[in-house]
Amino acid sequence: MKAIYRGMCPNCGGAITDERLAEKNPCEGCLSEPIKAEDYEKLVFAVRNALKLRGTLKDWEDLYRLNKEVSEVEDLFKRATGFRFWSAQRTWVKRILRGKSFSIIAPTGMGKSTFGAFISIYFAIKGKRSYIVVPTTPLVVQTVKKIQDMMERAGVNVRLVYYHGNLKKKEKEEALKRIKDGDFDILVTSSQFLATRFDELLRDKRFDLIFVDDVDAFLKASKNIDRSLLLLGFTQEVINRAWEVIKLKKQLAKLLQAQGKEKEVEELNKEIEKIEREIERYRRENNIGILIVASATGSARGDRIKLYRELLGFEVGSGRSVLRNIVDTYIIPERSIEEEVENLLRKLGKGGLIFVPIDKGIEFAEELTNYLKSKGFKVELVSAKNKRGLELFERGEVDYLVGVATYYGTIVRGLDLPHLIRFAVFAGVPKFRFSMDLEQPTIYRVLGLMSEILEFLPQEKREEGEKLYARLRRLIRNIPQYELMKIEEALAEGIELEGFHNHVLDVFKQAVEFLREVLRDEEVIRRISENPFLSLKEVEGKLYIEIPDVRTYIQASGRTSRLFAGGITKGLSVIIVDDQKVFNGLIRQMRWRFVEFEIKKFEEINLESVLREIDEDRKKVRLVIEGKISEQVKDLVKSALMIVESPNKARTIASFFGQPSKRRIGELVAYEVSIGDKMLTILASGGHMFDLVTTEGYHGVLILKDDGKPYYVPVYDTIKRCRDCGHQFVDWEQKGVCPKCGSRNVHDALENVKAMRELALEVDEILIGTDPDTEGEKIAWDIRNVLSPYTPNIKRIEFHEVTRPAILKAIKEARDINEDRVKAQLVRRIEDRWIGFELSQKLWEVFENRNLSAGRVQTPVLGWIVQRYKEFTESETDFLGLTLENGISITIENAKGEVKEVEVKDVVIEEREINPLPPYTTDAMLQDASRFLGFSATKTMQLAQDLFELGLCTYHRTDSIHVSNTGIEIAKEYISEEIGEEYFAPRKWGEEGAHEAIRPTRPIDTGRLIQLIRDGIITLPRNLTKDHFRLYDLIFRRFIASQMKPARVLYEKAIISTPFGDVEVEGYIEILYDGWSRVKPLPLKQIPKLEKGQKLKVTEIKQWRAPKVSLYTQGDVIALMKERGIGRPSTYAKIVQTLLQRGYVIETKGRKKLVPTEKGIKVYQYLVSKYKDLVSEERTRQLEKIMDEIEEAKADYQEVLRELHEEIKRYIRS
């Protein structure tokens, strides 16, 4: 037993040990001996029976009942289909049994339609009514057949009614009569039927379950959202109230951007909460039905869809995946494009898509198709006018399809045939082509061109272009494609539009005119022609710009790699390079979007092995589609819950895998995505949820006896935080009331635990992805403990950067909790509490001030600041500053008087190599951010935390300077492209350890990052401030410099003789080779060349008195902590912050120097005079070492606690 958690027993809600929780059992008060069983379900049943027998059964009954009902539903499913549930289907059933509405995000072959049909039968057996809404008549027929087959197999009979256009007249009449009379348990129709027959036949009906298969068709009539809500039991009045909340939240978002609107924000929040309470009351008092929406491929647009969020607690996501499992390759052609394509098809076999770039157009696509036909290939051309080829391809009558590579092209977007499409060939790089006068411009192409050429414009024009670009992007964000086409047509035909659309047209027009104007500038054209990433071509006397069309490449190549039940099919893409510059641009943009993107020469891949993998995946997909999948493959798709600390991190991770669906669980938001082999729900825990209590044991730690020796067990309870005054505490003095200000507006982390337990019930496994250090490990341990009884499997995942490859790798390498790290953190917290409480109480007694407090690590640090201040005040002296005729400035200490001339006594000039510094560790970053940016340590850590959580930098709490291979690759790419490959000098900088140095996660500098965020290529869950960019720039430059060749300078060191003594001057005369100084200034000043014996006139004299010793900044103090082995990367900033918060130290305004206050000096003197050995620098350093030993399993943590306890008794309690 390591700890006790109050209020966490899953049965009685009382106190329970970590051991019992890990054994998935209730507390000892409920069951004297723990129950063991071979699997989770059996354990739940056995514990329930034991509790019942003992007469202590309480909340465990809910857990038992849920598992029992799932078993019953699964038995029926087995009878109806012959299969057991997939993990994902089991999750869906658990949600339904608990009355939750949700959006299903799941890949091809996950049995969504089968599940919808089955669950309606289950509801019918239970006397409940269901409605299945599908997009088309063939799907109505298919769904009805599924239901009938299942009823027959399961031997049940329920009343089924369906309606579609192919029914005979008499059948239609009978169906309509039965619908009108409510003579059915299950109704199946198209979404069109819901839209047209609602008022006449459905308005008065009430359903327990509505299953919407394919939300895209359903949403074509946005009124269907209101209709579905009415059918589930809401009134129009409640729907209108929810609509009010949506509008109020929009207003609130705007107010939060403005300054000084706190009062309005508070009032709006109150109004929103009031309406939300009304809605919640209505839901409680009325038995509202369940809505299940099978995921969209497009994104659900418009505000009306948000009604589902307000009334049913979920948001529809998009099933569109951004995962790629594609081998990207290229060929530099040695013969005609047609011959290269023919040659490739002979090597690759059947099942290919061939994309012709837009500059070659439909004519070339026709020529290529005819050429391939003449060579004996079964191939068809597909275009908007001729889609016949699609059916022939699907039926296997043709082996290849040819189409033009445009974003909305028929075979670029419309094909989802994971079992048939094996590879894609690009007969030229996908590109946009623009004539200089921009004939027939489209909105997306204009945005693409603007984004590419803004960097070539003069400053003033660039700023104008950036504003126009941002406006146009913002305006079109929620406009569907068909409406954009109307705007484009209006511009071409020179006609006006109505209202908002006319406003968009106006801005579009301005953007086109802006481009036409800047493209007449010869300097701009010259710069474009020299750029290696876009192409300038003359065709028939006309100039054209060609830029890569990366969106089309992603979409088109993506046809070869689809998400299916069990993973992502492997695909192959081959680009025949017809323009090297546009190809370079395409690669660069792919790397911006996909951290893991790499492209190889086609002849360098192992083609046989790639094709074998491609074909194995196609076999699996066919089996899934035909329903012949084996049990073993079925369990490839697990439902999993990933828990991280912060909402930013949760949102960033979710965004890697498409547009997530969202569910509100209590006060938390869960994001759901599919990653092929996992249906992943991502949730933010909100960081630390537990802390030591103050009302039990010795300051929250029980002291028990084990073999006559004391044994220490911390007691934890949830952390409470007052939303009004910010006070944080653990023990209630009065339940629900803040002990500091009396407010009832208090958040208890218990609510977060309940939300996590609710989600834990649904899934097969939990992955805990808290920060990769001892603190993160302790949070993970707490989460593991309190969730253990609710789920069969819990693992810890660790990642040092928030990027898609790092997350997927962490999931693959999931491990158990590192108990030694946890023990080290337990000791750190207990030691902190004991010393803190004991010393604070002494300070209260002596100074009669209950606001004072003390800690072991802060005390020596406070001492350094006190000592430095003393030296500062005692070191005042006279300074003389001389400026010489050649511009050199020198300062002389202890000097007063006039000087007219000085002489160069000695000079050494030599060539010197200056190496770059290693990339940042935490302490070095804090020092530089303090020195160059004027940031406090706390501010820097918060900004770095944001950059980490947003996936822009690696983990920022580290004392390692090591750079991984990934890091070296990033530097290589940036240096080669932006500076020159000859500057690259890879360095590992030290041994590989648990952590890496702080570095960027992509080869993108600050200017480019700002542009990519502006262009929407990088989308972040929160806005970055100017200070985020300043810190990113510091980290980026230091890292890139660390991977560049040394600089070489002509170094000079001179001794200058003055009447007051000699002064040394050093610097460089000139840079011989710039090396890393291309990205960061050198640490030396440039000085003029001097000669021995040279006499120099003094042109300016300044005299002043000042202290010789300067005061510390936050950066200086952190450098000392690192140097003297006190504190850790995770505590440096906190230690300084604590001293400032307690008022022991203040920071001067301008130069940000640290000055001890009178209170700080008195407290320090008292502590050192009474408890010197306890708070000495040496003892603190020793303890840091002991913590490391516990972490490395070299010290027994109980033994360490015994020593600490003895030490405190010896020094304080005696």
Swiss-Prot record:
It is an enzyme of class 5 (isomerase). ATP binds at residues 89, 106-113. Residues 93-256 form the Helicase ATP-binding domain. Residues 639-802 form the Toprim domain. This is Reverse gyrase. Zn(2+) 2 binds at residues 722, 725, 738, 741. CDD domains: DDXDc_reverse_gyrase, SF2_C_reverse_gyrase, TOP1Ac, TOPRIM_TopoIA_RevGyr. Its main location: cytoplasm. Monomer.
